[in-house]
Amino acid sequence: DFLTAPIPPGAAISSLVGHYERVDWFHAPIDAPENTSICDHFNALGAAGPDESVEVLTRSIGQLAAAMAAAGPTTYVPWQDCALATDDFLVVRLMELAVHADDLAFSVGVKPPKFVPAVLDPVLALLAALANRRHGQEVVLRSLSRHERSSGQASAFGPAETSTPRHAG
C-alpha cells in the first residue's frame, strides 16, 4: 500500500546507505530492544503457522506487479519517516530477502537459495558499503581481498571488529 502513498511534506529523503543512519537497530547491540522487538514482531506474525504465512506470501506476490507499476520514483517509508528512491528501497528489500533466506536456511540446516546476479550484486554492494561504514575501509578491503591481512569479521550488521590485522611475512 505504501508504494503509492504520498510523501509527507518535510519528510527526509535518504540515500540507500544513509538511511541506515536513521534506523535505531543498526547502531544497537544485537540483544537490545531495538533488535529483539523486530524478532518478537515477526515471531508473532508467524505464530499462526506456516499455512497463514504461505497465504500472506501468495497474496503479496499477487499484488506485487500492480504495486510496482503504480510506484513512483520515490517511496515513502512510514516506519522510518523518510523517503528513498524506489530503486534503493527495492535494494533494501532484496537485501532483507537474501539475508533472511540465509538465516532460515542456516537455522534448519539446509543450503541457502542461490540468487541470480541481478539480485545478489546490489545486495552485496549494499552490505559492503554498510560494512565499510561500520568497520572502515582498511578492515573491509582487507577482509574482502586478502585473508592473510584480514583482522577477522567485517559484518555489515555485526559489532565493530577491534582485533589487529594479520601481517604477511
Predicted regions and their residues:
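Structured surface interface patches that mediate subunit assembly and partner/cofactor docking
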Residues: T4-A28, L45-G169
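Penicillin-binding protein/beta-lactamase superfamily catalytic region
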Residues: A32-A44
